[in-house]
């Protein structure tokens, strides 16, 4: 197995950034891995987080999965920002082109996976709902909620919505512009139902002591009511790496 750090000038972002890759042992024999996992970091994190804080290298080798870990701004919510950089375009187009152009990763949609934690979990579902034909399965770890309930009303990040330099203003302009857009996690579900979209398999997990546990339960109940099937798991734990380390392996085993 091998780990690669690719530092390069992104054409989409216009600055140097990093992508980290884990390749299972089979690639040393010239064979493609069984699947490719695009693995997203959380808010205030970076592309190295999964390598530093979990056993993702061991899991990649165990399940014969290549792992691609891009790096974005820690509060961008994987958006094409209204005032900033086009991170969603970067993720969904350039990162894929780099990974599939440079390395022997599996390029078949039925062998592509996406997952993330917290903000990255939101990003994983955003990618899967907005590009449903691209993945076989998607996992949202501790990032399962109505984004309007996070930033609006009495949400735990409502104060950030009032900050003119905060994530709402920079990423979307305002709550009004966020609501109903491709970044609105309720709209993903509603649009899929309206259009009869065939979605990838969906996996969600969270710690039962996580501060967003109730929000997650509310969102999953809404998905169920709308006929969107989500495989759900929970375990004791907070918003922490012990949960994400356990659940990313469970997802990898479940998705194959």
Residue ranges of model-derived segments:
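Non-catalytic cap/lid and distal C-terminal segments of serine-dependent acyl enzymes
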Residues: 1-256
């Amino acid at each position: 197995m091998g780990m690669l750090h690719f530092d390069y000038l992104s054409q989409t972002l216009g600055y140097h950034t990093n992508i980290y890759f884990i390749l299972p042992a089979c690639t040393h024999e010239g064979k493609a891995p069984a699947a490719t996992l695009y693995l997203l970091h959380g808010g205030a994190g970076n592309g190295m987080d999964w390598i530093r804080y979990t056993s993702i290298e061991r899991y990649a080798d165990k399940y014969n999965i290549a792992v691609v870990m891009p790096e974005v701004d820690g509060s961008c919510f994987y958006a094409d920002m209204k005032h900033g950089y086009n991170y969603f375009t970067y993720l969904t187009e350039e990162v894929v082109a780099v990974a599939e152009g440079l390395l022997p990763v599996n390029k078949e949609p039925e062998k592509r996976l996406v997952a993330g934690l917290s903000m990255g979990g939101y990003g994983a579902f955003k990618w899967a709902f907005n590009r449903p034909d691209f993945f076989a399965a998607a996992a949202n770890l501790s990032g399962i909620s109505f984004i309007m309930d996070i930033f609006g009303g009495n949400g735990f990040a409502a104060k950030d919505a009032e900050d003119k330099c905060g994530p709402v203003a920079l990423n979307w302009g305002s709550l009004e512009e966020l609501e109903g857009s491709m970044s609105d996690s309720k709209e993903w579900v509603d649009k899929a139902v309206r259009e009869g979209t065939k979605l990838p398999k969906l996996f969600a997990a969270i710690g039962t002591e996580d501060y967003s546990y109730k929000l997650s339960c509310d969102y999953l109940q809404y998905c169920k009511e709308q006929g969107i099937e989500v495989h759900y798991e929970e375990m004791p734990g907070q918003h922490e790496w012990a949960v994400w380390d356990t659940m990313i392996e469970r997802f990898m085993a479940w998705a194959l």
